[in-house]
Swiss-Prot record:
Annotated protein name in UniProt: UPF0386 protein TM1040_0419
Region of interest (Disordered), ranges: 62-85
InterPro entries attached to this UniProt entry: YjhX_toxin (IPR018654)
Organism, scientific name: Ruegeria sp. (strain TM1040) (Silicibacter sp.)
Family designation: Belongs to the UPF0386 family.
Length: 85
């Protein structure tokens, strides 16, 4: 599966324990997303178009109206990368 660089960054943050909070319009559509790392920092690469691509590919999921997290398919798709800490 082809995953863009921005999608890969977001998936990597989610795989480390991050989450995506979202705002819905009255019609039920997601209008705004904010991606948080496990430390509570905001990831700037996580825009609405990147989120929609990840959701369309079923790489992120939300259960019981909770924040979006990485799905099992997303965990298998994300490429390993070094974490410079």
């Amino acid at each position: 599966m082809n995953i863009s660089k921005n999608e890969q960054r977001v998936l990597h943050v989610l795989a480390q324990g991050g989450r995506i909070l979202y705002e819905r319009a009255p019609n039920g559509r997601v209008t705004e997303v904010t991606c948080y790392t496990r430390e509570g920092l905001i990831l700037a690469n996580c825009k609405l178009d990147v989120f929609n691509k990840l959701r369309r590919k079923r790489l992120v999921e939300s259960k019981s109206s909770r924040p979006y997290q990485i799905s099992e398919k997303g965990r298998r798709s994300v490429r390993a990368q070094l974490d410079n800490r």
